[in-house]
């Protein structure tokens, strides 16, 4: 399957890494474009994917087109690519707050749309991603898209009205927990404990079973 990424920031890099680690595609089947040539060069060096330098070309090449840009830039990106023939392509957006209906309105076309919300632990392959599928996504593409999302963590399929709820739980909560751990460690360091030990004592250790989790 050919996969295209418009936007090659941290989340796109996490997704590309997961796809390659799980052998869902080879680098030659992954296309990408970014706002700057520096980002494209960096991602090409990291993963060996094809960088196009052109959102239109990325869209043309992809079977699964992933819109990995921030919400404030999404409308502009869609405007750049919506006039080409996107028949047969599945469009996956990871922009927060942009509904399936909004995507269809912007593209002015009845395409297969997917909305997903990954979180920052995806950067280390431990993400929790909420996903909802539009009615035009075929079972085959749903399976392939789910495999991509599963490649960097756990995926939870939800009705769309719960996507914003998920954002509050899994999108923001990891950052809050990281800040709490940092603050606890800072307190221990202030009392003379080495930072490495402070972090170790603050972290939650996780076994294969959530029931076996213990705090150290």
Task: Describe the predicted segments one by one.
Residues 173:
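Aromatic-residue-lined binding/catalytic grooves and analogous aromatic/hydrophobic interfacial grooves
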Residues 30, 40, 58, 194-202:
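Small-residue helix-packing motif on alpha-helices
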Residues 102-112, 128-165, 177-207:
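Internal alpha-helical scaffold of NAD(P)-dependent oxidoreductase catalytic cores
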Residues 208-216:
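Single conserved hydrophobic/aromatic residue that forms the stacking wall/gate
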Residues 13, 17, 21, 45, ...:
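Short, well-ordered alpha-helices that flank and scaffold nucleotide-derived cofactor binding pockets
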Residues 1, 28, 49, 89, ...:
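A structural micro-motif
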Residues 1-46, 51-53, 126-127, 189-191:
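NAD(P)+-binding Rossmann beta1-loop-alpha1 motif at the extreme N-terminus of oxidoreductases
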Residues 37, 46-47, 55-60, 64-131:
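Rossmann-like NAD(P)(H) cofactor-binding subdomain of soluble oxidoreductases
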